[in-house]
């Protein structure tokens, strides 16, 4: 799928008054934030959608930037941030076009970014790892291949889903603090709802 096609796909999906993934933060992101993040941190939310996760992080007092390739989603994110009285740097960008800077962020959140095919995924993980400051945290949640049985969200493409061996390879050079496969109930708007096959990941960049 080309950038133009992908942008149209997500614009069409987000083009509704409803927040399709809800306005509450991802449960695992919230848990990991409370466990690992504190202080005056610069945080990046990758492919942030309608802003539920970036708004939560900003409400914790962090300095947050977030990007998504859908202008429709970014406009909804801005409205959600305004409603919650937080300031966030929102940008329209895809993962390849984002201006990645080395050793820039104290934390990066990548929640359900499985639109990325294997080639894009490899580039994206390389960028995220490079952009983390040493000693800082990468937080990821995504679907495992078993998700295709549940059909409760996700791309439905096996090659886009996470396995433990894949994640260990992608995170080469980082210390993995959490790497857990599990099944659990998701209730995130009307598009992530029901029993789901999940992978939770937290990794730290060595000093």
Identify the residue ranges that each predicted region occupies.
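Conserved SAM-binding loop
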Residues: 77-78
């Amino acid at each position: 799928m080309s950038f133009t096609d992908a942008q149209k796909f997500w614009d069409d999906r987000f083009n509704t008054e409803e927040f399709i993934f809800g306005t509450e933060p991802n449960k695992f992101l919230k848990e990991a934030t409370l466990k690992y993040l504190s202080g005056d941190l610069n945080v990046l939310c990758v492919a942030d959608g309608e802003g539920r996760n970036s708004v939560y992080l900003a409400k914790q007092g962090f300095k947050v930037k977030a990007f998504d390739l859908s202008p429709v989603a970014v406009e909804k994110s801005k409205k959600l941030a305004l409603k919650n009285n937080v300031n966030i740097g929102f940008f329209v960008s895809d993962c390849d076009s984002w201006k990645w800077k080395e050793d820039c962020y104290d934390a990066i959140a990548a929640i359900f970014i499985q639109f990325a095919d294997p080639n894009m995924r490899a580039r994206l993980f390389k960028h995220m790892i490079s952009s983390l400051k040493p000693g800082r945290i990468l937080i990821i949640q995504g679907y495992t291949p078993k998700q295709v049985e549940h059909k409760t969200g996700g791309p439905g493409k096996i090659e886009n889903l996470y396995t433990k061996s894949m994640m260990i390879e992608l995170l080469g050079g980082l210390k993995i603090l959490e790497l857990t496969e599990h099944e659990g109930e998701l209730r995130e708007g009307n598009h992530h709802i029901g029993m789901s096959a999940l992978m939770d990941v937290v990794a730290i960049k060595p000093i």
